[in-house]
């Protein structure tokens, strides 16, 4: 990272290299500080599952974390050296508690710049293959993290970083997502997310110690 090596001392870089070598490409669970570090230096690649029923309702999950609260399209970060199909299956189990039928091709690509970082999501259409193992709430019942609810239209209290899914659902309703996967973008939060390109460069690649 020419011109920015001074951001980390030689000792800190050596420590970081040692930590990365210990992970050994296993996609292991990352400690929170290391996960935050990853989010600060690269974009994460995710899968999102847009589950709809025969009536066109969409199934959303309640999220409540330091970056906001609201209903969101369930998704998951692809682990290192993990195939997309495996992550789609894991996401379905984790978020819905049941299997889902997932379309082979992504219906949209969604990039989000927020206070957490920068994510690029492959959004796939999906339908449930069973009864969700997570709690389904209806009416005015107060949701808790992980609860699911069917919506005929995107609710007013969408998770702040998922407001872009209003555009995705509207485009899907007009039949505009049947022939490809267009890009949808959202900028949200206090950080400067409007930069088109990062500063600096990446130094020559080298094997981990």
Residue ranges and their predicted role:
Residues 125, 135-174, 185-207:
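NUDIX/MutT-family hydrolases
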Residues 53-56, 64, 127-133, 153-155:
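Short loop segments at secondary-structure junctions
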Residues 93, 97-134:
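Active-site segment of metal-dependent pyrophosphate-handling enzymes
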Residues 53, 57-95:
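Conserved Nudix-box catalytic region and its N-terminal flanking loop in Nudix hydrolases
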Residues 2-48, 185-187:
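Acidic, metal-coordinating catalytic segment for phosphate/diphosphate chemistry
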Residues 43, 69, 118-120:
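Residue-level preference for beta-strand/loop junctions
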Residues 50, 60, 123-125, 150:
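Conserved hydrophobic/aromatic beta-strand scaffold that supports enzyme active sites
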């Amino acid at each position: 990272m020419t011109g920015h090596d001074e951001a980390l001392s030689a000792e800190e870089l050596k420590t970081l290299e040692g930590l990365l070598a210990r992970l050994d490409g296993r996609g292991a669970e990352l400690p929170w500080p290391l996960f935050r570090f990853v989010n600060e230096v690269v974009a994460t690649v995710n899968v999102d599952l847009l589950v709809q029923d025969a009536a066109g309702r969409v199934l959303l999950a309640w999220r409540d974390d330091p970056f906001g609260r609201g209903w969101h399209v369930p998704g998951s970060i692809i682990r290192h050296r993990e195939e997309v199909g495996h992550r789609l299956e894991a996401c379905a189990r984790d978020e819905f508690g049941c299997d889902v039928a997932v379309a082979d091709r992504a219906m949209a690509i969604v990039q989000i710049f927020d206070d957490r970082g920068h994510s690029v999501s492959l959004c796939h259409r999906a339908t449930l293959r069973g009864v969700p193992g997570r709690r389904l709430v209806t009416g005015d019942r107060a949701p808790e993290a992980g609860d699911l609810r069917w919506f005929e239209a995107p609710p007013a209290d969408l998770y702040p970083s998922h407001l872009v899914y209003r555009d995705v659902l509207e485009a899907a309703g007009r039949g505009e997502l049947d022939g490809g996967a267009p890009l949808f973008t959202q900028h949200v939060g206090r950080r400067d997310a409007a930069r088109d390109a990062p500063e600096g460069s990446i130094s020559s690649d080298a094997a981990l110690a």
